[in-house]
């Protein structure tokens, strides 16, 4: 009986170790990928389309002489698209906050300042009706609906342009040539229901 137990124990141990030695080479034939998932659960009735989470709007080149004449450059259109909107929506509220703006700078986005930056200019934002969007001030837009129900996909159309900080033609030579780089965060604060 003792011999049978020893033989059985030896057989079990041999099979365990042989399985381990056979499994080890398989580990050398595999590779791994680490997967990190991110997301956010919100109480908002719309979400920003992931393709619009980060945008670069190229405002082009503008001469100092054009700013002397008109005080602003041509407007460039862009949009922030929203998805998964609740059908009971009747308006969307948003705020644009400038990353370099202080409390008194509400007419335009203040550009970053460095050795190659233009001076005397800002980046102005307006809606698609050319109405000014003040920095840090909540703005309300109606939703697009069909049959009294808001569409699932909505869009906030906007325009941006480079202009003098006074908003007028640069008659005193306050504008200098250089790069203009401004950044902002647009927050969809809430979406109203009827």
Curated annotation (Swiss-Prot):
Disulfide bonds join 46-85. The keyword Disulfide bond applies. Pfam families: Fimbrial (PF00419). One of its GO terms (biological process) is cell adhesion involved in single-species biofilm formation. Keywords: Disulfide bond, Fimbrium, Signal. The keyword Signal applies. Residues 1-23 form the signal peptide. One of its GO terms (cellular component) is pilus. It comes from the Bacteria. It is found in: Fimbrium. Belongs to the fimbrial protein family. This is Fimbrial protein 987P.
């Amino acid at each position: 009986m003792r011999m049978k137990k020893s033989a059985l124990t030896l057989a079990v141990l041999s099979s365990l170790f042989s399985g381990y030695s056979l499994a080890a080479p398989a580990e050398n034939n595999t590779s791994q990928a680490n997967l990190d998932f991110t997301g956010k659960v919100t109480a908002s009735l719309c979400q920003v389309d992931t393709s619009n989470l980060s945008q670069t709007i190229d405002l082009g080149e503008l001469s100092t002489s054009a700013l002397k004449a008109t005080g602003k450059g041509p407007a460039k259109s862009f949009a922030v698209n929203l998805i998964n909107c609740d059908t009971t929506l009747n308006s969307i509220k948003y705020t644009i906050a400038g990353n370099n703006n202080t409390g008194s700078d509400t007419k335009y986005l203040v550009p970053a300042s460095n050795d190659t930056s233009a001076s005397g200019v800002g980046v102005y934002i307006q809606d698609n009706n050319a109405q000014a969007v003040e920095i840090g001030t909540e703005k309300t837009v109606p939703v697009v609906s069909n049959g009294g129900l808001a569409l699932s996909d909505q869009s906030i159309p906007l325009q941006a342009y480079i202009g003098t900080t006074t908003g007028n033609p640069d008659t005193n030579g306050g504008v200098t040539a250089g790069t203009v780089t401004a950044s902002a965060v647009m927050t969809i604060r809430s979406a109203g229901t009827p």
